[in-house]
Regions:
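Cap/insert and terminal regions of metallo-dependent hydrolase folds
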Residues: 176, 184-237
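Binuclear metal-dependent hydrolase catalytic cores
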Residues: 1-178, 227-229
Length: 237
């Protein structure tokens, strides 16, 4: 295991990932680089600041894709800021936002942004709803979305419901990074993480406080150890 300390950096050949942070209920933010292309995964609060410090304005303008695992605030809290910054700085190349079917948070953010700035958006935004686990390619990476199991509490704080949630495998030049997002233990993540060059696995609970929303440390480690390298993220502080 590689010990958690943010930001986390990993690189193999010309494929790299930087996890700016992954703190439950606060924020997540991930930057993936494949060659000269940049992609953002789960742009939580603070992502605009982190991207500016790491890659700067010009390369932010060149970002072509956002990948959303689910709609909880700690994973999408920076979307509005990122879209607005791209507008203010006159991005002209298109932006695709990939997200699970039923993720109303992303659709609501997009609709509100479009309503507020309908006459002054210089770039095209395409919502790409993911309805099935099927490989697709964008720029120079192959992406494999897969279903995961994540829930949220209802208003009574007792009952729960399933939320639309995905994990993603990113493949570039034969190198595979698997990111599970927020999830309970699930077989689809087990399959995707096995043999990956890097697995990023959430460990939202200690072993003595298991639930059906997040994995325990032991569960997360068992999945991570099936990959060549792994990070445990989303560990409560």
């Amino acid at each position: 295991m590689i010990h958690q300390k943010y930001p986390i950096n990993w690189k193999k050949k010309d494929f790299s990932i930087m996890i700016f942070c992954s703190i439950p209920n606060i924020a997540t933010g991930i930057l993936i680089k494949g060659g000269s292309n940049h992609f953002v995964v789960d742009p939580g609060d603070g992502i605009l600041r982190d991207l500016n410090q790491e890659i700067g304005m010009k390369q932010i303008m060149d970002i072509s894709d956002l990948f959303i695992t689910h709609g909880h605030h700690d994973h999408v809290g920076g979307v509005w800021a990122l879209l607005t910054y791209m507008r203010v700085m006159h991005k002209t190349s298109p932006l695709s936002i990939h997200y699970p079917e039923g993720c109303v948070e992303i659709e609501s953010i997009y609709n509100a942004f479009k309503k507020v700035y309908s006459k002054t958006i210089p770039y095209k935004i395409s919502l790409k709803v993911i309805k099935q686990s099927k490989n697709f390619k964008t720029k120079n990476i192959t992406v494999r979305p897969f279903p995961v199991i994540h829930k949220e509490y209802l208003h009574d704080g007792v009952r729960t419901r399933q939320v639309p949630a995905l994990g993603y495998s990113f493949i570039y030049d034969g190198i595979k990074i698997c990111y599970g997002g927020d999830t309970a233990y699930c077989e689809d993540l087990v399959k995707q993480a096995k043999g990956a060059d890097l697995a990023i696995v959430e460990a939202g609970h200690e072993d003595d406080t298991p639930d059906d929303m997040h994995m325990t440390m032991s569960e997360a480690k068992s999945i991570g150890e099936s990959a060549k390298e792994y990070f445990l993220v989303h560990v409560p502080e």
